[in-house]
Design a protein with these regions (language model features):
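Asp-based, Mg2+/Mn2+-dependent phosphohydrolase catalytic module
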Residues: 1-32, 39-44, 48-174
Length: 174
């Protein structure tokens, strides 16, 4: 897989089959983006199906650490609500935040997966450290201006790569 492409692309996080796409491949830890991956920018809610998916993944033995470039109080509140460790102000794609997140959950590179909605921050950050990266389509289309610019760059690298479809957890609001 080229450095500038996700290892796998999914339409949303709930389409990642926990057993087939994570556990069976030997991943025990996930470094997880927040904004537009598990948390909507427009409503500031974790959709119910995403909450269900996170619960099922934890039940399967997956350890999570949230990794976000965001620095607002809301990301810390979300981490507390989900009972997950967090590395905020991450400055992704730079390696230190990913290394610190791995350290926080005692994760090894080979068994750690990164999941996020942006190529430039999440995928490149993972690949800089030799970790696998799954990219998901953003939960909502509404984005900040600088994120819209990055999405245009993503289209250049990803081209017409189509998302995989896997399981589906019930949809609603968590």
């Amino acid at each position: 897989m080229p450095f500038t492409e996700p290892d796998r692309l999914f339409s949303r996080i709930t389409r990642i089959d926990i057993q087939r796409d994570i556990v069976a491949l030997g991943y025990t830890s996930v470094l997880l983006d927040i904004d537009n991956t598990i948390f909507t920018r427009d409503t500031h809610e974790v959709p119910r199906d995403v909450g269900v998916w996170l619960g099922r993944a934890r039940d399967a033995g997956i350890t999570f650490c949230l990794v976000s470039n965001n620095f607002h109080e809301g990301v810390y509140q979300l981490a507390q609500r989900l009972d997950l460790p967090i590395v905020a102000k991450a400055v992704k794609p730079l390696p230190p935040a990913f290394l610190f997140a791995r350290h926080k959950i005692s994760a090894k590179r080979a068994t750690t997966l990164v999941i996020g909605d942006q190529l430039i921050t999440d995928v490149l950050g993972a690949h800089f450290l030799g970790m696998c990266a799954y990219m998901v389509r953003p939960l909502v289309e509404q984005d900040l201006k600088h994120t819209l610019l990055l999405r245009n760059v993503e289209r250049f690298f990803i081209g017409d790569m189509q998302p995989e479809e896997g399981c589906s957890c019930e949809e609603s609001t968590f």
